[in-house]
Swiss-Prot record:
It catalyses: tRNA(Leu) + L-leucine + ATP = L-leucyl-tRNA(Leu) + AMP + diphosphate. A motif ('HIGH' region) lies at residues 41-51. One of its GO terms (biological process) is leucyl-tRNA aminoacylation. One of its GO terms (molecular function) is aminoacyl-tRNA deacylase activity. Keywords: Aminoacyl-tRNA synthetase, ATP-binding, Cytoplasm, Ligase, Nucleotide-binding, Protein biosynthesis. The gene is leuS. Its main location: cytoplasm. GO terms for cellular component: cytosol. SUPFAM superfamilies: Anticodon-binding domain of a subclass of class I aminoacyl-tRNA synthetases, Nucleotidylyl transferase, ValRS/IleRS/LeuRS editing domain. It comes from Jannaschia sp. (strain CCS1). ATP binds at K630. It is an enzyme of class 6 (ligase). This is Leucine--tRNA ligase.
């Protein structure tokens, strides 16, 4: 009998698929289409087990849909622009382009041995001029459609690297790379006007039925729709032409609890005061250090500066509130000013205690009968808005009412009194896309002294990045290139300058799904192809992309519809979304002489006696099931796994060990067990194949009850595996395949029935273990490639149970089982049980002392 050898099997079938063009997407025939897409990778140079799990899930879906008769589009590419390539250029003296293209070649070489059903003819990289040239064309179309704006914005500026930093790149107020104190700087930036679509993007979430509820909630919170009151506190003494402070609040019902007014360091009044006071200027400068996200501002220590200004309360002009400049107020939300109600906001309470400001309650908790309950004096009282409370300083609505009702009543009252107006605001801001970096898509505009800002002519696209740049000094190499910036104005022909900012890399990934439908077209999309293939039927990726990437893609799809590049049906581009769990692995740690942690690769640790040891006998601390991380060395190289066990083993294990939405822990023992199981499947199928060849058709016994039992289990397995794959229950489907393999191994059915079962087993395993399945199919004489074979269909008649399998106990211990007709008589069951091999061996010619049949339940043999 031959041995299961993935190193021989897998390359053979990969070559066969490639030569046959098996996975080249086609629009031919009267078939339904199916577009499955996994989020494309950044070309770091190495794939990891997380990639393997993600792409294997998509591959199972793609292969299954192909077998179900669909034209399948399953492409792959690279999200190839980004800061890492520039870092490589600075750290290692490698050009970003060379570094990126080598990494992409390496990753393709690592992905191909995994046997994914990818249409490699559609391979694209966002750093290819063919791709970003079409992105530039899209940008121009969006400019002309009024979807792009150019305006000033406050950014994180690294004065050493001379670049804008994302909020995530600011660490403790310093640039993550240079270590320089980050400045908040106002720069002219390009923006996509995504905020114009806030309400539409929010409302449309309700129609995304096949998206995880968690993702939709995260997007809804990010869009952040709120209903509130916008009004003004009048300044007691005007300053610099300002006589009021405009405030937006979502809790106007707490106005009578106000004890201070806070303004952002970037508020116009704060800027006026900066010019008049060195102390205020120093405080505002300190506030501008660090990140600009709401999350970072919320977690920072709350600091304020009493400006000495006072405002009048709109309901009690005799009452005056102090005005503070506060570091926790962002200029780009609301009006850049708030009133503080410490009794009902934890942040305001911290601030009030720090600066000895009054704390005045406007409402108190009550029980179900409306009786006042004691408050927790140590914390602000912030009940959920739907909960009823008793207002002790209310001014609108009922004395007992919910927060929601009180807010509505307060807005109505204030509008009637001429104190502001009710407004709806959104947290979502316009998408700033300007980056002062080289390795990105050039923004296709020209700055002309006579004409102003002018879009480049489309016939001049792509505007390609120059290769001859240097990274030996900080800043954007495009700014200092001797010739690249210089260009004639597209409008008047006079000497002009190119825009040197490049696009945020999120732009590149916000439309790639549409480009995959026609990756070689000379326009961003091709009408026939995009009409046929869109929408993406199944999108697969990590929950970490729930907000920015997915939200930006939803906006871009709308923009591309407006500019004529997508049909109306595609404004929500992803019909179904699945967010997979991570692959984890234990961490193996020791400490060095200075008690610093030292992390060890899994292959260097010997696991024995319940612990882990290095080659020299040093015991290691085992930290279980942590996210794989290069810094912790708890990573597993897929290429090494393929060399040791084969691609099918890696695929089988990442699918079988856990539900796909949960994390899966990679263990050597789990991989070994998966490999052994596939070896057993191979051996079983080889044995059945040999047995069938050794017996002539005429010599085979007629079909009997063993055949019926086996084929019945086969059809049940077809049903269960189909349901499992359709519902992303891959681990449940694999559990059914394990069970059916065991059934087949024990079966006494005819060779013909066993061969049919083997062929079906191969088809059901093909999406998960395509190479092994192809080999089994070929050995059993299957027609063509199993990758082209139709999916088996369960025979409904065979799913109706006409038999029952009863366990046989001998002296109280289960030893065997017997399958009989559901309506079999007691005598028939006894006869079949006494003929069972295990019972015959146990009796050894003697009669049983007692034989007990519990109909439909069990057979007990007492010896």
């Amino acid at each position: 009998m031959s041995r299961y050898d993935p190193s021989m099997i897998e390359p053979k079938w990969q070559k066969a698929w490639a030569e046959a063009g098996t996975f080249t997407a086609s629009m031919e025939g009267n078939k339904p289409k199916y577009y499955v897409l996994e989020m494309f990778p950044y070309p770091s140079g190495r794939i990891h087990i997380g990639h393997v799990r993600n792409y294997t899930m998509g591959d199972v879906i793609a292969r299954h849909k192909k077998a179900m008769g669909h034209n399948v589009l399953h492409p792959m590419g690279f999200d190839a622009f980004g800061l890492a390539a520039e870092n490589a250029a600075m750290d290692r003296g490698i050009h970003p382009k060379d570094w990126t293209y080598k990494n992409m070649d390496d990753m393709r070489d690592q992905m191909r041995p995994l046997g994914f059903s990818i249409d490699w003819s559609r391979d694209l990289a966002t750093c290819d001029p063919d791709y970003y040239g079409q992105q530039q064309a899209l940008f121009i179309d969006m400019m002309e459609a009024g979807l792009i704006d150019r305006k000033n914005a406050v950014v994180n500026w690294d004065p050493v690297d001379m670049t804008v930093l994302a909020n995530e790149q600011v660490e403790d107020g310093k640039g993550w790379r240079s270590g320089a104190e980050v400045e908040r700087k106002e720069l002219t930036q390009w923006f996509f006007k995504i905020s114009d679509y806030s309400d539409e993007l929010l409302e449309a979430l309700d129609g995304l039925d096949d998206w995880p509820a968690k993702v939709k909630l995260m997007q809804a919170n990010w869009i952040g729709k709120s209903r509130g009151l916008q009004f003004a506190f009048g300044l007691v003494e005007p300053v610099g032409g300002h006589d009021r402070v405009d405030v937006y609040t979502t809790r106007p019902d707490t106005l009578l609890g106000a004890s201070f007014v806070g303004i952002s360091p970037d508020h116009a009044i704060a800027k006026q005061l900066e010019s008049e006071s060195e102390d205020i200027a120093a405080f505002c400068a300190e506030c501008r250090k660090g990140g600009t996200t709401a999350a970072e501002v919320e977690t920072a220590e709350k600091l304020g500066f009493d400006t000495g200004l006072k405002v009048r309360h709109p309901f009690d002009t005799a009452a005056q509130l102090p005005v503070y400049i506060a570091n926790f107020i962002l200029m780009d939300y609301g009006t850049g000013a708030i009133f503080g109600c410490p009794a009902h906001d934890e942040r305001d309470l911290d601030f009030a205690r720090k600066y000895d400001l009054p704390v005045v309650s406007t409402y108190v908790p009550i029980d179900d009968e409306g009786h006042v309950l004691p408050e927790d004096g140590g914390a602000a009282y912030v009940p959920p808005k739907p909960d009823p409370v008793r207002y002790i300083r209310g001014f609108a609505g009922e004395e007992i009412q919910s927060g929601n009702d009180a807010i509505d009543a307060a807005v109505t009252f204030c509008e009637a009194e001429g104190v502001g107006q009710g407004v709806t605001k959104f947290r979502l801001r316009d998408w700033g896309l300007s980056r002062q970096r080289y390795w990105g898509c050039p923004i296709p505009v020209v700055h002309c002294d006579a004409c102003g800002v002018v879009p480049e002519k489309k016939e001049n696209l792509p505007i390609e990045l120059p290769y001859d740049v240097t990274f030996d000094v900080p800043g954007n190499p495009l700014d200092r290139h001797p010739t690249w910036r210089n260009t004639p104005c597209p409008s008047c022909g006079a000497p002009a300058l190119r825009e040197t900012d490049t696009m945020d890399t999120f732009v590149d990934s916000s439309w790639y799904f549409a480009r995959f439908t026609a990756p070689h077209a000379d326009t961003p999309t091709s009408k026939a192809e995009v009409e046929y293939w869109m929408n993406v039927d199944q999108y697969i990726g990590g929950i970490e992309h729930a907000i920015l990437h997915l939200l930006y893609s939803r906006f871009f799809a709308r923009a591309m519809h407006i500019t004529g590049h997508l049909p109306r049906k595609a404004i929500e581009p992803f019909d179904a979304l699945f967010t997979q769990g991570m692959v984890t692995h234990a961490i193996y740690k020791t400490t060095d002489a200075k008690n610093r942690p030292v992390y060890h690769y899994p292959e260097t640790v010997d696991l024995r006696d319940g612990g882990g040891y290095l080659d020299d006998g040093t015991a290691v601390e085992i930290i279980p099931s942590a996210k794989m991380s290069k810094s912790k060395n708890n990573v597993v190289d897929p290429i090494e796994i393929i060399k040791q066990y084969g691609a099918d083993t890696a695929r089988w294990f990442v699918l079988s060990d856990s539900p796909p939405e949960r994390d899966v822990e990679w263990t050597a023992s789990g991989a070994e067990a998966a490999y052994k199981h596939l070896g057993r499947v191979w051996a079983l199928c080889d044995r059945i194949s040999e047995a069938a060849r050794s017996v002539s058709e005429e010599a085979q016994p007629a079909a009997g009850e063993h055949d019926t039992a086996l084929l019945r289990e086969m059809h049940k397995t077809i049903r269960d595996v189909t349901n499992g794959v359709d519902s992303f229950g891959f681990n449940a489907a694999i559990a059914k395949l394990y069970a059916f393999t065991n059934t087949l191994q024990k079966s006494k059915a005819s060779h013909k029935a066993q061969r049919e079962a083997v062929m079906t087993l191969a088809q059901l395993m093909a999406p998960m273990t395509p190479h092994l399945s192809e080999d089994i199919w070929a050995h059993q004489g299957g027609d063509g490639l199993i990758a082209d074979a139709p999916w088996p269909v369960a025979n409904e008649a065979m799913l109706v149970e006409s038999t029952v399998t009863l366990p046989i106990q001998i002296n109280g211990k289960r030893r065997s089982e017997v399958t009989v007709a559901k309506d079999a008589s007691k005598e028939e069951v006894e006869k079949r049980a006494l003929a069972d091999d295990a019972v015959v061996r146990a009796l050894d010619g003697a009669a049983p002392k007692k034989l007990i049949v519990v109909p439909g339940r069990i057979v007990n043999v007492v010896i």
